[in-house]
């Protein structure tokens, strides 16, 4: 039953189906009918489906890890819980743990201010320290981006204090930490040298830390980054070696994820196949990365293109096909993803316009069976962050927060009737049962309108007779789609104070209303009292 539904949905998404509006409905192109498939669940994703990353580049100069002690930053991260926090990225393979390295003065200042009995309740970073780091951050960010563009990466070391800072951030933000280990530490015969990982495991074990692990980042690009070529067979054997280390340590029950490959193109797919053959059994979920565009050349039109959005489908299908063939039943995660690679697209990836890519990727991932999607990056260098250098939440943060509050892990299916559905994209889940306003059986519909006119959506019977809560997001200010401020139902979203998120207030619609979605906007509609058995 599910396979025919999936084919129907995919054909509709790619524009192959051209059903007309049913007889008796108004022949206007701006009023559209929806179809819901709610008899059974289509997919089920993790409660931590929407997760986040901290790029390993933040530890290049460990002083800047002190940012993670900010109560404001932690409050923003806590809003996205439950979630995984992945510490990884290109610099993963250029970071070396030095247990004898002394903490930086900034780190030392932070730890001296802590109450060891209540580390999450007492954390305060000196305002002077934060101000100094924020003044220096633009220069550090330029160094990191230049290193990335020039592909000239240098090894850096991090201390026990750096690990403590990262773990403290995850724990106090109620996130589950996934730590990426350096895979480019090699013996002369190119096997993985696990000695540095062993030092880190020993330290984390002594502290009682609960951590999951990865090994390496985008191994398909090792030659470009370090002039070292590792094939999938060797990489699989390296993961088996890491798994053995974990089994001999306090981390015998820890999860292991990988191989964090890049886009699924020819040689990368070949690497994945041989990796899964050699090491597929020891990973708990398969991880891969996706970006739509090159951040240096991406345009506003690209960010609003349904054709660009649809390219993601084919990438997912390639990954799922290989996974099913080599390791049937293995869960697949998007271990790192955003709009554009290379740190994002300036003046685009941190604006309202980026939300179309982000929300659509979440919808497609859930529909296609990706269990977890890790957003690059929560905070850090580049333009694709959720929170900026002043700890101000950006449009994609607010979009992520709404998704967390309203969207549950049980996935259903919705479809727009009629032709040209690619610019009006709809997704349907059971509502998050932990939202105090809603109950089991309610539905959450989320919608993206890429048309330049308002679209009026008509719910199918019997849903059209149910009350609906609207959560519509629109840009605020004269910058329009390039704005870094967002309004929810006409109210600008901003933090109440340093540690308090605003209320996300619904706009109730009377039963029988059409759902109006203005041009170039997106939002959520919670259908109350839907009483869908599959959601209960």
From Swiss-Prot:
<feature type="glycosylation site" description="N-linked (GlcNAc...) asparagine">
    <location>
        <position position="452"/>
    </location>
</feature>
<dbReference type="GO" id="GO:0005764">
    <property type="term" value="C:lysosome"/>
</dbReference>
<keyword id="KW-0539">Nucleus</keyword>
<feature type="region of interest" description="Required for transferring proheparanase to the Golgi apparatus, secretion and subsequent enzyme activity and for enhancement of PKB/AKT1 phosphorylation">
    <location>
        <begin position="520"/>
        <end position="536"/>
    </location>
</feature>
<feature type="binding site">
    <location>
        <begin position="341"/>
        <end position="343"/>
    </location>
    <ligand>
        <name>heparan sulfate group</name>
    </ligand>
</feature>
<dbReference type="GO" id="GO:0007160">
    <property type="term" value="P:cell-matrix adhesion"/>
</dbReference>
<feature type="binding site">
    <location>
        <position position="90"/>
    </location>
    <ligand>
        <name>heparan sulfate group</name>
    </ligand>
</feature>
<dbReference type="GO" id="GO:0042060">
    <property type="term" value="P:wound healing"/>
</dbReference>
<comment type="function">
    <text>Endoglycosidase that cleaves heparan sulfate proteoglycans (HSPGs) into heparan sulfate side chains and core proteoglycans. Participates in extracellular matrix (ECM) degradation and remodeling. Selectively cleaves the linkage between a glucuronic acid unit and an N-sulfo glucosamine unit carrying either a 3-O-sulfo or a 6-O-sulfo group. Can also cleave the linkage between a glucuronic acid unit and an N-sulfo glucosamine unit carrying a 2-O-sulfo group, but not linkages between a glucuronic acid unit and a 2-O-sulfated iduronic acid moiety.</text>
</comment>
<dbReference type="GO" id="GO:0071806">
    <property type="term" value="P:protein transmembrane transport"/>
</dbReference>
<keyword id="KW-1015">Disulfide bond</keyword>
<feature type="binding site">
    <location>
        <begin position="382"/>
        <end position="384"/>
    </location>
    <ligand>
        <name>heparan sulfate group</name>
    </ligand>
</feature>
<comment type="similarity">
    <text>Belongs to the glycosyl hydrolase 79 family.</text>
</comment>
<dbReference type="Pfam" id="PF03662">
    <property type="entry name" value="Glyco_hydro_79n"/>
</dbReference>
<dbReference type="GO" id="GO:0030200">
    <property type="term" value="P:heparan sulfate proteoglycan catabolic process"/>
</dbReference>
<feature type="binding site">
    <location>
        <position position="289"/>
    </location>
    <ligand>
        <name>heparan sulfate group</name>
    </ligand>
</feature>
<keyword id="KW-0130">Cell adhesion</keyword>
<feature type="active site" description="Proton donor">
    <location>
        <position position="218"/>
    </location>
</feature>
<keyword id="KW-0732">Signal</keyword>
<dbReference type="InterPro" id="IPR005199">
    <property type="entry name" value="Glyco_hydro_79"/>
</dbReference>
<protein>
    <recommendedName>
        <fullName>Heparanase</fullName>
        <ecNumber>3.2.1.166</ecNumber>
    </recommendedName>
</protein>
<keyword id="KW-0458">Lysosome</keyword>
<keyword id="KW-0106">Calcium</keyword>
<dbReference type="GO" id="GO:0061042">
    <property type="term" value="P:vascular wound healing"/>
</dbReference>
<dbReference type="GO" id="GO:1904974">
    <property type="term" value="C:heparanase complex"/>
</dbReference>
<dbReference type="GO" id="GO:0033690">
    <property type="term" value="P:positive regulation of osteoblast proliferation"/>
</dbReference>
<dbReference type="GO" id="GO:0051897">
    <property type="term" value="P:positive regulation of phosphatidylinositol 3-kinase/protein kinase B signal transduction"/>
</dbReference>
<feature type="binding site">
    <location>
        <position position="296"/>
    </location>
    <ligand>
        <name>heparan sulfate group</name>
    </ligand>
</feature>
<keyword id="KW-0472">Membrane</keyword>
<keyword id="KW-0460">Magnesium</keyword>
<dbReference type="GO" id="GO:0010575">
    <property type="term" value="P:positive regulation of vascular endothelial growth factor production"/>
</dbReference>
<dbReference type="GO" id="GO:0051798">
    <property type="term" value="P:positive regulation of hair follicle development"/>
</dbReference>
<feature type="active site" description="Nucleophile">
    <location>
        <position position="336"/>
    </location>
</feature>
<dbReference type="GO" id="GO:0045121">
    <property type="term" value="C:membrane raft"/>
</dbReference>
<dbReference type="GO" id="GO:0051797">
    <property type="term" value="P:regulation of hair follicle development"/>
</dbReference>
<dbReference type="InterPro" id="IPR017853">
    <property type="entry name" value="Glycoside_hydrolase_SF"/>
</dbReference>
<feature type="glycosylation site" description="N-linked (GlcNAc...) asparagine">
    <location>
        <position position="155"/>
    </location>
</feature>
<dbReference type="GO" id="GO:0005615">
    <property type="term" value="C:extracellular space"/>
</dbReference>
<dbReference type="GO" id="GO:0030194">
    <property type="term" value="P:positive regulation of blood coagulation"/>
</dbReference>
<dbReference type="GO" id="GO:0060055">
    <property type="term" value="P:angiogenesis involved in wound healing"/>
</dbReference>
<dbReference type="GO" id="GO:0030202">
    <property type="term" value="P:heparin proteoglycan metabolic process"/>
</dbReference>
<dbReference type="GO" id="GO:0061028">
    <property type="term" value="P:establishment of endothelial barrier"/>
</dbReference>
């Amino acid at each position: 039953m599910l396979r025919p539904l999936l084919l129907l949905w995919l054909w509709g998404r790619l524009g192959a189906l051209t059903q007309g509006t049913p007889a008796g409905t108004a022949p206007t192109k701006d009023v559209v009918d929806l179809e819901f498939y709610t008899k059974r669940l289509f997919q089920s994703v993790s409660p931590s489906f929407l997760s986040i990353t901290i790029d390993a580049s933040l530890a290049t100069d460990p002083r800047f890890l002190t940012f993670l002690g900010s109560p404001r930053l932690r409050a923003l991260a806590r809003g996205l819980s439950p979630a995984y926090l992945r510490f990884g990225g290109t610099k993963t393979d250029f970071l070396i743990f030095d247990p004898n390295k002394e903490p930086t003065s900034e780190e030392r200042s932070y730890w001296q201010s802590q109450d060891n009995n209540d580390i999450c309740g007492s954390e305060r970073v000196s305002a002077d320290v934060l101000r100094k780091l924020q003044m220096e951050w633009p220069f550090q960010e330029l160094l990191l981006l230049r290193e990335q563009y020039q592909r000239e990466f240098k090894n850096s070391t991090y201390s026990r204090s750096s690990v403590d800072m990262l773990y403290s951030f995850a724990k106090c933000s109620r996130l589950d930490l996934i730590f990426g280990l350096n895979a480019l530490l090699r013996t002369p015969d190119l096997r993985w040298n696990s000695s540095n990982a062993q030092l880190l495991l020993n330290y984390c074990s002594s502290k009682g830390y609960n951590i999951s692990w990865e090994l390496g980042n985008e191994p398909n690009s090792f030659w470009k980054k370090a002039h070292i070529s590792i094939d999938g067979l060797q990489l699989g054997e390296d993961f088996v070696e890491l798994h053995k280390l974990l089994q001999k340590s306090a981390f015998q029950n820890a999860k292991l994820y990988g191989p964090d490959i890049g886009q699924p193109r020819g040689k990368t797919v070949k690497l994945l196949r041989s990796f899964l053959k050699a090491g597929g059994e020891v990973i708990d979920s398969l991880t891969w990365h996706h970006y739509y565009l090159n951040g240096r050349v991406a345009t506003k039109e690209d960010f609003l293109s349904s054709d660009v959005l649809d390219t993601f489908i084919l990438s997912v299908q390639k990954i799922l096909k290989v996974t099913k063939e080599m390791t049937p039943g293995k869960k697949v995660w998007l271990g790192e993803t955003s709009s554009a690679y290379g740190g994002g697209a300036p003046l685009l990836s941190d604006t309202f316009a980026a939300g179309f890519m982000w929300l659509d990727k979440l919808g497609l991932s859930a529909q296609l069976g990706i269990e977890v999607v890790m957003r690059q990056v929560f905070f850090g260098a580049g333009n694709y962050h959720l929170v900026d250098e002043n700890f101000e939440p950006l449009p994609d943060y607010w979009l992520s927060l709404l998704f967390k509050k309203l969207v549950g892990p049980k996935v259903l299916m919705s479809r727009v009737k009629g032709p040209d559905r690619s610019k009006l994209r709809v997704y349907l889940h059971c509502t998050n049962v932990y939202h105090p306003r809603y109950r089991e059986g309610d539905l959450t519909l989320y919608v993206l309108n890429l048309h330049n006119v308002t679209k009026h959506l008509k719910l199918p019977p019997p849903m059209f007779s149910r009350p609906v809560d609207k959560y519509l997001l629109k840009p605020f200010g004269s910058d329009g789609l390039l704005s870094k401020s967002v309004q929810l139902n006409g109210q600008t979203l901003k933090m109440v104070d340093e540690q308090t998120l605003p209320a996300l207030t619904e706009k109730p619609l009377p039963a029988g209303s059409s759902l109006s979605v203005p041009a170039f906007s997106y939002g959520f509609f919670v259908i109350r009292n839907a009483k869908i058995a599959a959601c209960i």
